[in-house]
């Protein structure tokens, strides 16, 4: 028996959605995750994955069932969760992918570190933070795209203007 007690990484995040199709298009088509095998829970949903040191499934999605609450409809936005942070590579390619999909995003450079960040919302209004280590990128960051500076606490999700993916 192991007496060590430690958190070793992110296992998964669960997102509730009213639009499974658009949510899957975002997480698979924009973020590049892949669908993973999911047990039959008797309700719509998905497990999405990428290779991580601690496992495969990192995002679970509910689209119906008791987890959606008493009305069966979930509110949009992150509620008490501010964002989900994922390590990533390919900062410039992700910015281009966001532009091509007509997604609004924000950028941030963490002071006194080698980390850069991109913030973007999924179709359910969950803010996703992609964190990049400069040592894994193909060159320096350069200036932040005008009008895309990240400000903590700023909500830039607009469901009415969210593009069809």
Please name every model-derived segment.
Residues 23-26, 94-98:
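Hydrophobic side chains in well-ordered alpha-helices
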Residues 37-40, 82, 108-110:
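Short beta-strand
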Residues 67-69:
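Outer-membrane beta-barrel translocator/channel fold
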Residues 41, 64, 131-133:
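Residue-level structural signal for beta-strand termini and adjacent loop
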Residues 14-59:
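Core segments of cupin and vicinal oxygen chelate
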């Amino acid at each position: 028996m192991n007496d060590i007690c430690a958190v070793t990484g992110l296992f998964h995040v669960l997102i509730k959605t009213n639009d499974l199709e658009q949510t899957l298009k975002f997480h698979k088509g924009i973020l590049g995750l892949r669908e993973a095998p999911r047990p039959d829970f008797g309700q719509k949903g998905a497990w999405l994955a990428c290779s991580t040191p601690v496992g495969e499934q990192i995002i679970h999605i509910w689209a119906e069932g008791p987890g959606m609450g008493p009305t069966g409809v979930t509110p949009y936005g992150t509620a008490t969760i501010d964002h989900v942070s994922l390590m990533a590579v390919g900062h410039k390619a992700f910015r281009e992918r966001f532009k091509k999909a007509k997604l609004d995003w924000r950028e941030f450079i963490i002071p006194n570190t080698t980390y850069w960040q991109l913030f973007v919302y999924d179709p359910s209004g969950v803010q996703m933070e992609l964190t990049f280590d400069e040592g894994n990128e193909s060159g320096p960051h350069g200036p932040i795209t005008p009008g895309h500076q990240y400000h903590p606490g700023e909500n830039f999700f607009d469901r009415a203007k969210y593009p069809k993916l």
